[in-house]
Amino acid sequence: MATTSLLTDHYELTMLQAALASGAANRKCTFEVFTRRLPAGRRYGILAGTGRFLEGLADFRFNDEELSFLSSRNIVNKETLSYLESFTFSGNIRGYAEGEAFFPHSPVLQVEGTFAEACVLETYLLSILNFDSAVASAASRMSAAAGNRPCLEMGSRRAHERAAVSAARAAVIAGFAGTSNLEAGLRYGLHTIGTSAHAFTLLHDSEREAFEAQLRSLGARTTLLVDTYNVDDAVRLGVELAGEELGGVRLDSGDLVATAAHVRELLDSLGNTNTKITVTSDLDEYAIASLAAAPVDSYGVGTKLVTGSGAPTSSMVYKVVERENAAGEMQPVAKASAGKASIGGAKRAARRLNGMGIATAEVLGTHEDPSLLEDTRPLMVDFVRNGELLPGFTGEEGVRRATARHAASLAELPEAARRLSEGEPIIPTEFI
């Protein structure tokens, strides 16, 4: 795999150069990832991307090609190139489990190390967590709106080809049942889905020929796209050719509520009571909710999912919260800029629960560990110790664990969190 080290901003390395020159580069520091606010009206966010970051961390190194580029462009000096040549991360990383809900100021990731090794991770880390968490947060709202009906990720053609793989992973973590993206299926063991598009029908001289070809190749349990020409004619034709075994039909246009109801009635009248109806066509969580009373069996979601459904970033930041002073002690530090202030000190985090196991507050502490308080659930887990990645957070296993964590975390939130009405974060963030 190619190195991930240049998936970063120019200033990370010029800052490193200046720190090496000043003698401060080896000071121990703690950086935290958090968001100051949720997107307007959102009640919670869902963390995703941690596993991807950890996978890429193993490849965050500077090989000959990268060093040659940095040297030829005079981006950094020889001393900095020498440091980068042997760069490996040797610190500690902890944070919220992937799939966990987060709120304003939740320390979703905490990086401990020297300033030099922690600062250069900023851009790479944030680019992953901001995108993946935006998709997961949207996917969580969509899957909640869908209830027991599965949502299927179909957004690859609306995203960068690599981002599409990440989006598929994040969507499945946040409750989606599968993806159309084969690379995501290969890399993360995700269930993949799909049958045919309008182009397949238009390729043939008639809809009959197209359906016959699809059924011969894929079997009667396939899903036929029935709105290329006339929906009624296509449904009747599909039933004629496949009989009661026809797996499903897909609707991709028009008034989906009315059309789904009509198609369900038609299928039932033809004896195909078990044939499923899938709807697509630029769905978001609100469109899915509007279809709750319609006889729909599953939803295919694309554009709105991979763009965060109106919130394409999670607005996460990476800030140093403590650093080693001249006496060798860790000293809290904080940014004081108006509107962008940070809170100094390395945080510990826990979620306060009531007697029913429902979350009532996000509790953060610097001098006190809130996980030691009564009726709280600890939120921080270790991912990397002394530069060594702990097992279970990457690859297929990482996705499985994150999917389970999302389901448990969402179930723990007050019922109002799963509604689409706008409001403040569903639980407050408290500092102790």
Predicted regions and their residues:
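Ordered alpha/beta subdomains of enzyme catalytic regions
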Residues: 1-217, 320-432
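Glycine-rich phosphate/ribose-binding loops and adjacent secondary-structure elements
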Residues: 199-355
